[in-house]
């Protein structure tokens, strides 16, 4: 039997309209964007793209820390039918520049500190570099770009009203087999490889997510701690949640056990998506010291008491 999958952007579009005035993206202890805010910022990105001359199928690189604005820029690229190129911000600045050129990216979204460290003497395919911190123009081939974009965006409302939500989120959704992402990862050999990911793969993972994570819905919250430049974190801490109308909280700082546990306690996420390294850090720093106490060691050997201890540790963690 042939399974017909919905295009991710079609599902995202529906979520935007259904959850218009509800929170969509937050930076932990920072700014929050509702679905309306997000849709407005996406529309403003599209103005920038038009001024740069970006065309469907063109590449746009993103290299910055995890944050709400990274997600907005990523979604703006897809809803413009361009191809997103996520790059780990931990890579050396010149490597980021090389990957942007290797992918033939026309625009780079990054942090000012990263852009300042990239070698500008090399030939580049980039026509514009945009700050992820505030969406300002850091550099452009057209010296009038910042001024012309600002003038056009000034005509737009600060946030589009609900009456215009269908119009502002009327995204030009392409074919499900279109290229969505070129993902650069270090790989086992240590050299970055550009993996070409079509929307079909994203749609397939959404279907998988609905089967294994049915508890995620429009009341759910998640703490995004994995790199958005890696597909696991991007898919199951951001894209799947937004398509469900959930609220994503980004840890934009180093995800140390202390910061992670503090965020989990405050946000109270519906699920926690992690990798073994993070779980191991939490265990070594928070769980193991408790279990090694003399009284606790004894309690863990007594039927009934062991469950009380485990539940107490669990409640203190989350």
Where are these regions (language model features)?
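Structural core segment of the AMP-binding/adenylate-forming
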Residues: 11, 52, 79-162
């Amino acid at each position: 039997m042939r399974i017909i999958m919905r295009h991710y952007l079609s599902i995202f579009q529906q979520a935007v309209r259904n959850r218009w005035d509800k929170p969509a993206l937050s930076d932990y202890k920072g700014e929050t964007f509702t679905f309306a805010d997000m849709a407005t910022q996406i529309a403003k990105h599209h103005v920038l793209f038009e001024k740069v001359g970006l065309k469907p199928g063109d590449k746009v690189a993103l290299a910055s820390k995890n944050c709400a604005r990274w997600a907005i820029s990523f979604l703006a690229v897809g809803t413009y039918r361009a191809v997103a190129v996520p790059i780990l911000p931990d890579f050396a600045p010149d490597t980021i520049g090389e990957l942007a050129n290797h992918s033939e990216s026309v625009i780079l979204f990054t942090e000012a500190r990263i852009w300042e460290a990239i070698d500008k003497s090399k030939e580049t395919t980039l026509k514009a570099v945009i700050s992820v911190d505030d969406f300002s123009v850091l550099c452009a081939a057209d010296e009038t770009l910042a001024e012309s974009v600002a003038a056009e965006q000034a005509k737009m409302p600060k946030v589009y009203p609900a009456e215009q939500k269908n119009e502002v989120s009327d995204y030009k959704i392409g074919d499900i087999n279109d290229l969505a992402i070129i993902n650069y990862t270090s790989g086992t050999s240590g050299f970055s490889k550009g993996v070409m990911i079509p929307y079909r793969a994203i749609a397939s993972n959404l279907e998988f997510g609905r089967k294994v994570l049915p508890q995620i819905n429009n009341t759910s919250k998640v703490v995004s701690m994995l790199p958005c430049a890696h597909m696991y974190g991007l898919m199951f801490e951001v894209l799947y949640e937004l398509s469900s109308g959930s609220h994503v909280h980004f840890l934009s700082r180093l995800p140390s056990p202390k910061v992670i546990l503090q965020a989990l306690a405050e946000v109270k996420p519906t699920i926690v998506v992690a990798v073994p390294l993070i779980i191991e850090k939490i265990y070594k720093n928070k769980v193991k010291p408790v279990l090694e106490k003399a009284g606790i060691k004894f309690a863990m050997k007594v039927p009934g008491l062991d469950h009380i201890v485990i539940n107490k540790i669990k409640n203190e963690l989350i």
